[in-house]
Amino acid sequence: MKKIWYAPYKFESYGEAEIKAVEESLRDGWLAGFGPRTTEFEQKIAKEFGKKYGVFVNSGSSACLLAIASLDLEKGSEIITPSLTFSTTLAPIIQLGYVPKFIDSELTTYVPSVNAIIEAITSKTKAIMVPNLIGNKPDWELLRRELMRMNRSDIFVIEDSADTITSTEDSDISTTSFYASHVITAGGMGGMVMFNKKEHKKRALMFRDWGRIGDNSENMDDRFTHSVDGLPYDYKFLYGVLGYNMKCAEANAAFGLVQLERFQSFKNIRRANIERYLENLKDVKELILPDDSIKPNWLAIPLQTKNRLELLQFLEKNNIQTRVTFAGNVTRHPVYREYLQDFEVADTIMKNGFLLGAHHGMNTDDVDYVCDKIKEFYASK
């Protein structure tokens, strides 16, 4: 019996074209991610998101950290973020010394309303960090208009779009992920943070590349324009921030460029799978289906039911891989207990929510099989 995976498995999402591109990259002699393929990948992904600059990194989690670090906010600043989230959307807020201001989300969209965001704003609010969770989006355009109406254009809007690739010109900074389970992948890993302001990009590069002030120029006139205590010093080894090593390899960019060419076809398959799920399950009264009104590029099909564990056990026994809805109410997890709060929707989804595959490695027969098994489960009750 075929296994229905939550995410593309093995060769369901890549093939000879990606393998050839990686081989060509290696034969060209590029290893570190400073070559022409990385530059091209950064430019093309940034364009998809409506941003001017892209910085290729090793994961979406790293992209989220660099997004916040690039702003150089005052310690203790508040950053509004939803309780229904993924852990590494939240973690860098705390790691970098800022204060998360949690809000709830909406039951069938899985993202917060603009009203919820606006009502959480205080004089200490310096940024908003919201994920396009499972691929759905809040109304970023309305949020930007409301911030302008409030004369709070000082608040940075960060869009964590790890779960999907989309165009959101109304955010200041966007991040995305190329992890193996996502819409496209850069060889199983990778992420990108994207900016409109060059100074934010420059600061992100410093944090990505060990904290160094310099870039990859080999020009001696560039390299020795700085000094340390009066000593002219190579800015390739001059450090301005407490940095990291978050680079990806050139081969990852080569892989990602081929995937980007296939993005529209992947997206179309996912859309067809989502619509088939919704049609097949519309009469299953035990399920809460997602709000698909804006036709988002869903990462997976999010569902809710009151007897989740029993259903998931049944599906797994029938070779259907399942997932819960990420962190649910993240403040209930061990590492975040000091922020513990009740959130009606996040708590409900933590209790009842789950995800099933709708990816481009699946076909209509796969979706029908999953739906038939769900109906079989409820028919036995």
Give residue spans per PLM region:
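N-terminal "arm"/small-domain region of PLP-dependent enzymes with the aminotransferase-like
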Residues: M1-A32, G240, G357
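Conserved active-site segment immediately N-terminal to the catalytic lysine
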Residues: F156-G187, M192, E199-K202, Y235-L238
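PLP-dependent aminotransferase-like
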Residues: A69-S161, I165
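PLP-dependent aminotransferase class I/II
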Residues: P36-K44, E48-G54, N115, E119, ...
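Conserved SAM-binding loop
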Residues: F56, T81, F102, V193, ...
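Phosphate-binding glycine-rich loop
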Residues: L31-E78, P92-Q95, F102-D104
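Hydrophobic/aromatic ligand-binding patch that stacks against planar heteroaromatic rings
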Residues: A91-I93, V183, A251
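Short secondary-structure boundary/capping segments
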Residues: F11, D154, T166-S167, V183-I184, ...
